């Protein structure tokens, strides 16, 4: 096994790529007129030559991540467990469907990378009738996996083509079983990367598996205190060009799931300032407090039409506000966090190159005053040198 001194860590993002070695950390804007490998070689060729393929570890979010639709029996167990596993595997969830109401749900128009079917403990069967077959027949999807009760596994296997059957994510004591679905989704991400023409060429320089960036960042959370002055419970906001990832202490949710990890993840897929710029603006325009925030920042809605450093800064500040709204009782999404219990908020990703601590604290204070009617002030920690990613990448690589 290589030591950290002999290892090169690379992260390929939607907008930037980063290269970290013992001696330095490089960050470069991607040139979208070139293949990723060609761009990487052009800008970091001398560094790459110093390492063997066995000593180069790569993670990536440049393929946009995998999308999943989850069909389950109840929100209490099956849907909740499958959603938790998917998010913590670096998968983007587009919707969760309660099977008994499946006829009330619209059909997504986009291609879905994987559909997950889940529900029931192994002593119960007969939970999925022909309505499931009818709904799936209208979907455009690439993979279908079943992680529900054992009796229905046999029935559905005979009815649904190319169904992958894995052990139930709900055991007989209603506890979560993570391993099998998590491994499946991680491997599916790997296959997706290998199928992406622009990313699979990266295997010319590495002999190691390429993992999802959010998964790698998640490896840093248990050891975050070794590099940062962070007090539990905390949240980590990774705000970039295409998405915003949030990693949070489980103490911040009421309905906690007992798993091996002390932190969970949620992703807001279309909340970024470059590739997801228009989606971010649309979300802001539909938030009744965004206009007031713009006034607080002494700008108007005309800033949405500008392409300047100032506009990028304002959009980053809006992203902070909007994602906090989405995790609050004001605009609840998948989870509602106990934001008044947070002691630290850690920021990483592209945001660290645009905003300083004062810029961030201004928005956090505005959110707490306006939305939560509170003077609560969590400590802001800004990862200005991507040390969190480096920490997670080293931890992940040491386990390989």
Briefly describe each language-model feature range.
Residues 241, 290-306, 385-400:
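Long, contiguous domain-sized segments
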Residues 1-9, 24, 31-34, 39-233, ...:
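Nucleotide/phosphate-binding catalytic cleft detector across ATP-hydrolyzing
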Residues 110-113, 272-306, 310:
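A structural-propensity feature for long, helix-poor, extended segments
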Residues 14-39, 80, 88-95, 257-279:
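Short glycine-rich, Thr/Ser-proximal phosphate-binding strand/loop in the N-terminal lobe
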Residues 206-213, 301-332:
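Adenine-nucleotide phosphate-binding core of ATP-dependent small-molecule kinases
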Residues 222-227, 252, 326-329:
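Conserved helix-loop functional segments at active or binding sites
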Residues 232-291, 356-375:
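Glycine-rich phosphate-binding loop of actin/hexokinase-like ATP-binding domains
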Residues 242, 248, 321-322, 326-344:
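Hard-cation-handling environments
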């Amino acid at each position: 096994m290589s030591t950290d001194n002999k290892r090169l860590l690379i992260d390929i993002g939607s907008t930037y790529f980063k290269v970290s070695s013992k001696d330095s950390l490089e960050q470069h804007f991607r040139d979208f007129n070139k293949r990723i490998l060609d761009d990487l070689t052009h800008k970091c060729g001398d560094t790459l030559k110093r390492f063997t393929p066995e000593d180069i570890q790569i993670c990536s979010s440049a393929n946009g991540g995998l999308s999943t639709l989850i069909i389950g029996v109840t929100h209490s167990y099956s849907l909740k467990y499958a959603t938790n596993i998917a998010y913590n595997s670096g998968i983007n969830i587009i919707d969760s469907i309660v099977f008994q109401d499946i006829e009330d749900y619209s059909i997504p128009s986009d291609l879905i990378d994987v559909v997950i079917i889940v529900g029931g403990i192994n002593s119960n069967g007969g939970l999925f009738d022909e309505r499931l077959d009818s709904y799936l027949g209208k979907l455009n999807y690439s993979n279908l996996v079943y992680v529900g009760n054992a009796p229905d596994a046999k029935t559905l296997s005979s009815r649904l083509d190319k169904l992958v059957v894995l052990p139930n994510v709900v055991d007989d004591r209603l506890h979560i079983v993570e391993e099998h679905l998590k491994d499946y989704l991680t491997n599916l991400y790997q296959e997706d990367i290998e199928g992406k023409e622009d990313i699979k060429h990266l295997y010319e320089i590495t002999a190691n598996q390429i993992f999802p960036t959010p998964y790698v960042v998640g490896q840093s959370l248990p050891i975050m205190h070794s590099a940062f002055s962070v007090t539990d419970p905390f949240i980590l906001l990774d705000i970039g060009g295409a998405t915003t990832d949030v990693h949070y202490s489980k103490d911040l949710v009421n309905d906690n799931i007992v798993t091996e990890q002390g932190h969970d993840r949620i992703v807001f897929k279309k909340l970024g300032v470059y590739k997801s710029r228009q989606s971010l603006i649309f979300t802001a325009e539909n938030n009744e407090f965004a206009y007031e925030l713009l006034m607080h920042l002494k700008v108007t809605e005309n800033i949405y039409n500008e392409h300047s450093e100032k506009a990028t800064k304002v959009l980053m500040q809006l992203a902070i506000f909007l994602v906090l709204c989405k995790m609050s009782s004001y605009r609840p999404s998948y989870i509602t966090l106990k934001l008044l219990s947070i002691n630290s908020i850690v920021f990483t990703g592209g945001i660290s190159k645009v905003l300083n601590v004062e810029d961030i604290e201004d928005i956090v204070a505005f959110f707490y005053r306006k939305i939560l009617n509170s003077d609560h002030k969590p400590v802001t920690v800004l990862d200005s040198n991507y040390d969190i990613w480096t920490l997670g990448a080293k931890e992940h690589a040491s386990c390989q």
